[in-house]
Each structure stands twice: as C-alpha cells, then as structure tokens.
Swiss-Prot record:
Note: Several mechanisms have been proposed based on complexes formed with substrate analogs. After activation by the glycine radical, the cysteine radical, Cys-413, can abstract hydrogen atoms from the other active site cysteine, Cys-412, and from coenzyme A, and it can also transfer hydrogen atoms to product radicals. The other active site cysteine can attack the central carbonyl of pyruvate and covalently bind the product acetyl group.
Pfam family, one: Gly_radical
Name this protein carries in UniProt: Formate acetyltransferase
InterPro entries, A to Z: Auton_GlycylRad_Cofactor, Form_AcTrfase, Form_AcTrfase_GR_CS, Gly_radical, PFL_dom
Biological process terms in GO annotation: glucose metabolic process
Protein's organism: Staphylococcus epidermidis (strain ATCC 12228 / FDA PCI 1200)
EC identifiers of the protein: 2.3.1.54
Protein function: Catalyzes the conversion of pyruvate to formate and acetyl-CoA.
Domain Glycine radical: 625-748
EC class: transferase
Gene name, Swiss-Prot/TrEMBL: pflB
Pathway annotation: Fermentation; pyruvate fermentation; formate from pyruvate: step 1/1
Description of how the protein assembles with itself and partners: Homodimer.
Compartmental location: Cytoplasm
Amino acid sequence: MLETNNHTNAWQGFKTGRWNKNIDVREFIQLNYSLYEGDDEFLEGPTKATETLWDQVMQLSKEERERGGMWDMDTKVASTITSHDAGYLDKDLEKVVGVQTEKPFKRSMQPFGGIRMAKAACEAYGYELDPETEKIFTEYRKTHNQGVFDAYSREMLNCRKAGIITGLPDAYGRGRIIGDYRRVALYGVDFLMEQKLKDFNTMSTEMSEDVIRLREELTEQYRSLQDLKELGQKYGFDISRPATNFKEAVQWLYLAYLAAIKEQNGAAMSLGRTSTFLDIYAERDLQNGDITEQEVQEIIDHFIMKLRIVKFARTPEYNELFSGDPTWVTESIGGVGIDGRPMVTKNSFRFLHSLDNLGPAPEPNLTVLWSTRLPENFKIYCAKMSIKTSSIQYENDDLMRESYGDDYGIACCVSAMKIGKQMQFFGARANLAKALLYAINGGKDEKSGKQVGPSYEGIKSDVLDYDEVFERYEKMMDWLAGVYINSLNIIHYMHDKYSYERLEMALHDTEIIRTMATGIAGLSVAADSLSAIKYAQVKPIRNEEGLVTDFEIEGDFPKYGNNDSRVDEIAVDLVERFMTKLRSHKTYRNSEHTMSVLTITSNVVYGKKTGNTPDGRKAGEPFAPGANPMHGRDQKGALSSLSSVAKIPYDCCKDGISNTFSIVPKSLGKEEADQNKNLTSMLDGYAMQHGHHLNINVFNRETLIDAMEHPEEYPQLTIRVSGYAVNFIKLTREQQLDVISRTFHESM
C-alpha cells in the first residue's frame, strides 16, 4: 500500500509497523495503546447536550412502551445499507450520528431472512406489510427461511416441533458475526476495497464449487463497501479515507456497524473490541491539545447512546426465546495482551462510566475480559459499577487468551472469536433433559406421545436402573447429535445463499476460521435427574398407554451447584460425551465444532416443551438458565455454586459456559469498599478455578417484586440474565417470575 497524504495525516504520531502496509489492527493496537493503571478520578460527568439527548431517548422509550412495544415501523422498504435517508435525534447536539431508518426508534423491515417473519412482526404490533413487498419476496425473491424449510427432513421438523431441538436460526437472522468495524476508521473504505479486489484477482482459477462461491461472496463484499461509502455521504462524511482524529474514528467505526445492522437483523449483532482501539485516537488528541477529557467522554456517551437504541422488528415467537428486546451489541473491554501487559485504558473506564452518565441499560452488552492481572483500580471500578447497576458481565480472559490471542471479542453472550479472522454458524441448542425422557420412553415424546426419536422398547422396570437408563441415553444422544448437526448444515447453507452478511464479511479477512456453534440446554436438569436415578430411588409413573409421564422419588440425592463431585462429575461427563458425538458429524464448510452451555431466556420455553423429569422438576417448569444449578438447589452458598459451574470444561465448550449469579448486597459486606473488594476477590477466585463467564446481579428480591407492580417507577432497572442484560420491565410476567424464583445468595 502506498501511503497517500490522507494516510500520512491520519496516522501522524502513531508508531509504524506491518499495519501501515497490510490490514493488521491488532499490531496497530499493541504498538500504540497506553496502559492506564490509575483510578476513576479523571472521569467527567454528562454535558448538557448529553442530558438533553438522553431525555429525548427516554421520552421515545416511554412512547414506545405506551404503543405496545413498537414506536413506528417500516412496512414497505426492504432495509439495506442505503435504503433510508439520514436520520437524527437532534442534528445540532449529536456528536455521533446515524440511525437505522430515517427516524430514531422506527424499526426497519428486513425480509431476506424470511418474509413470513417480517409479516408476522408487522402484524404482532398492528401494522400491515405492504402487499407488493410481500409478493416480491414470496413469488420472485426466495428467502433464507423458505430455503431451510424446503430442505428440512420430516425427522428435523418433528424434532423442531417437539422441542428437543429448538431456537434454531431458521426463522430469524443467525447473527453472531462480528465485523472488524475498526478497519474502516484505521484504513478508510477505499483501501479495504483495494484489498478485496486484490484477493479476488489472485484466487485460484480452478473453478470448483468452493471457488465459485467465494468469488461471488467477494464481489458482494466489494459492493457492500461501495454502499458503505454512500451511507457515509448521506451523513456528510467521506469515509473512503482513514479517520484523522478521535471524533472521526468513533463516527467511522459506528457507520460501519450501522451499515451492518441496516442490512442484517441477526439475533446478536455484536460490536467487537473497540474501546482500547479508540483510546489510541483519544490519547493522541488529548496529548496534542486538540480535545478535552469532557469532550472525549461526551463523544463516548453519544456513541453508547446510539448503541442503546439499536432496534429490530421481531416476531412473538422470537421474543419468547430472547425476551426483552435484546440486540447483543456486545463490547469487550480490558483483557491482557499475550506479552503480559493489561489492555486497560482510560476508555475502558469511559465506556463503563456511561452507566453513570446515562444511567443503567442492557445495551451495549458491556463485557469485561477479566484477568487476575488486570490493574487493581480497574477491578475495583468494575465491581463498583456492577454493584451499582447490575449491567456488566465478566468473561475469563486468562482462559480464552490461550485459544484466541489478545484481539478477540465476544459475540452475543459468551462466544469468543478472533476479530476479523473468525466467524461462527450459530446453532441454538439441543435439549438434553428431554433427550433423557426420550431414552426412558423409547424415543416417544412424553408430552404428545408421538414417536420422534428412534423407536425401541421403553424402560419397563418399576424402579429406574442407572446403567440401563444411561445405556439408552447414550444411544439417544448419538441420534440427537446427528439430526442436530444435519439441521444446522441446512440452515447455514441457506443463510449463506439467501441472506449473506456481505458487509460484516467484507470486514473480515478473505480466508477465515468458521465454527459450528452448537449448544445444550437442560444440563442441570439432566445431571440432577441422573443423580436421582443413581443415588435415590426413582419410580416411573406411566399413563394408560404405558408412557412414562411422571416420577416418584424416594430418598435424597446430590444436586449440582453444591460443589459435590458425585453430581458435578455427571454434568462434566454429559458435556464431554455430547461434544464427542457432535464431532463425529461432518459440518457445513468444514467448520470446527464448538458448543455452549447457554439458554438466553429460552430456559422458560424449554421448560414448557419438557415434561416431568426424574429430578422432581414438574412439567412446564423453567430450566435453569445456561450452566446454572436449578433454582434453589444450590444451598451451600455462593462459592460452592460457583465451584460447581467452574468444573464444566471450557476445552469442549468453547462457545461459552454461561453462569448467571445473583447476590444480595449485604452478603458482600456492610461498607462500599468491602463490597468492592469482596466482589473482585470472588471474580479472581472464579477465574483461577477456570470458570468462564459470570453475569452478576446485586440487588434484593423485593426490588424486583416492586418493579413488577410499579414498572413506571423502574424505566432503567437492568438485570443480567443468561448471557445478556435486559430492562426488567420488558420481560413477560412469566419470565419476571422465573428471575425472581432463582437463588439470591445471602452468604458467600
């Protein structure tokens, strides 16, 4: 790359390296970031403009709630990068501009994932999809959803309906792809286009199916970058060139992200790892006297504000799975470099400080990459903000850095990937608790009585025998792993074909790592059920057709969540065993198998789909979220509960292990300083035990009960659920009750 005057000016004062000639954002960061080990005294409060704009956002949020959850919606124009004119909150006050349509809070219509879903989303809120648009995407332009259902087998459809596999991204955008939006700020769009053209022209000329597909994808990526430049022009910016200062760097990066969410409505549209990158520009401008600390914070606050108002039109079925209108604009903060230097900067503080300046909020999904080696002042600040807002999640950087290096980000909730070098095929999750019931009933569904799994004689004994049950369970997991992977192969083939993420992939290297991100639900239910069968006496109760529909338990049994190796080892074995079975099946585009123990809020849906289980859980009752112990069963205090979850091996769950943890304030200590110190010590201990992820809620149950009864008094009450945060008042009452029923630890 020949450095133009634009590049020379934009990069003035930066240490040079390979990144000057080639795309290498990581090297740019490592050469130029400034470690900050001080405290939070430098932080600035909100400016008048920030307060005015946030008041406007809160008023729009109030109006949206009053209108039933939808402020306005586009029913005619299919959303693309350039489909809508520029939109503003207040053009004269905003330091960072850009919204998804021509108005803030107006939701776009995105039909490429499925016209039926677009129509259902409209109708759910009293809107009507434009008939001509519906005709186009029904008769002339096939969608992802239609492609998937054209290819599904009857077996797959039966599994989907029964809920032994559910939440599949066949009726919504898959998401969980992180474009390296930093590249637009550092290099400008023109250089990125040059690189894609170069890759296209140097590809193999042996026209295999793989080569043909990649050539078409590269062409689409190139066109999307042209559209991105046009989006910049709509807002008055020339983003063909690199950003020359901090304000431009934030704006350029945000426009790249905005382009992605204008074109895709994936279940998780995550941001990446931007705070340390942007701090390099802020520090240069501060050192040169071109900007003040207050101006830097104002720009960050306005950036965060934009990320808070990302919105998609969703169907009621989607909202059952992922409740509370989440978008998973996940920003990964902190961590430690492979050279041992913490990557904490002043911007790490500024991003978290937005929780003070704007108040708590679920988005962006602020994720601290925790290491025992983070600066102590930053640890204390994180703890303080967690106790104050319950808006932060923590993920073990010491664990992930070994696999992903020091320039990875978190997609959605707990899924690590190298920024710009790796993407995943999101796969929802298989229901291990229901699979156990299928093993007992010879493949018949315990709720419908239909033959869904492979047919064999159900267990006939009057008392369940552990060895007999487990032998059949293993066979059922063999079958489930196969139908699961095959379903995902269809889904992602069709998503690439009919709803390709061209802009997000344009901000990746051309040659990337792909993972097939499977998942499991009901781990604690399955582990406790097997523990009950092994250590107590479990008698199956059959209906008139001989189907086991309930269980009678005599005696006690070890329960997952109490640091009891007898049952914890069952949970570990299930995870390792199912992952081995998944790996035996070929994946689309030779993607690497990964797995998560994560449910989002679909633990409620899974519970509805699953009958009585041998652990004593009743039909329809919610599962525990993620890798959590079942509600109320972790009775030996916070540390024992954490110890059980920390045993789940990350090596076979590299898509993440979610643990949502609630503790009452007094159990952390009487004084603020003690609470902060105790929480950081707990996080350090969990990290040293190889625990992967921790959502932390610090509040009393009574607060949530009051918010249920008086939602108007709690417009910004934020809680952490399985892998994300949510406005508590946006949950359904059923989900609110589920949250309230969970364990609130009153002792360490």
